[in-house]
């Protein structure tokens, strides 16, 4: 029996994919959000899903629908307030996700870093082997009626994942990435412990993470990594090239064969290893796993590349020092003979205050560094720190860029420009690309 769902905040990076899933499953889906364009709305529009501006009248008009409430919306939001007044059926985003988890063999991917890339890779492999629905944090969702598997990105922010009860879970790492919510790393670890205790079958955790080693869930834990003395699934004989990464996999002394991924950086090998581990334990054909790993093309805003004349532009969501390390490492592997120029927009004042020194250290891996001003959030409009303070600690700092003045970036030729950030770094990237395209055309 099909239903009608109304999403309050339908353009959210989780809400959009969930809306797509429910639509694909034959339900009537619509929702509301802000007017300004976001990259998550394109697939919604392509599916014919109606997007309305926020209005209390929407609730009156669709009062018979099931309302899905986005995590960002409090009781005083105009539509939430009206829904509460009318007493319509309203469920939270996590509750709606859990409904999908409960219907299939479910695999959740959680971690401070790497969860979107890992979820995307896992979904790609599994969907090509068996009927699979998936929800990825880059705004991508797909619903398949009578799915055998459901692959989902599980977000730890504000403990959104705490009530998920998947069959399997991949835990990529634990880190203090949300200082605006969590008290400290111990608080984050407690949240992951709560989540892990809901996993029904097996957990696959990165073996080098000391906080993941502290977890004592009811489910069996298989550690993956590069240490044959402590890990269950081990990547050995690692070879990195400008075409990708290659490695052998051993499970508790048993060789599973050689694998390759068209991805770059040590983190990509670990992500792929976790996917191999889950698929192997679900008794999927190893030859199929190998084949589909090689055809993966990535997810949005994770090392996304484009070429403009002699310049390679990379767009990445990296907004934490660990993620910057991984992105610049990947750029070095793929482009070992080119200048790597980092353009970074810090995200939230609380994160910059917590990691100012670490940001500077991570960015030193680039040949030159440029910063945009800090992107705040709905909860943090301003703070007692600036991007210039990060720049002052970077020996290769080139200056602060402005959207209407890209002159600092224009002298580079045959270089790799790496734009990183979780705010609106894309507007700087687009401004640079537009000017670069004009200048290169004029020179021809």
From Swiss-Prot:
Record: residues binding ATP: 111-117
UniProt keyword terms in alphabetical order: ATP-binding, Cell cycle, Cell division, Cell shape, Cell wall biogenesis/degradation, Cytoplasm, Ligase, Nucleotide-binding, Peptidoglycan synthesis
Keyword ATP-binding attached: yes
GO biological process: cell division; cell wall organization; peptidoglycan biosynthetic process; regulation of cell shape
Family: Belongs to the MurCDEF family.
Pathway(s): Cell wall biogenesis; peptidoglycan biosynthesis
GO molecular function, one term: ATP binding
Source domain of life: Bacteria
The enzyme's E.C. designation: 6.3.2.8
Known role: Cell wall formation.
Subcellular location(s) per record: Cytoplasm
Protein name in the entry: UDP-N-acetylmuramate--L-alanine ligase
Listed NCBIfam families: murC (TIGR01082)
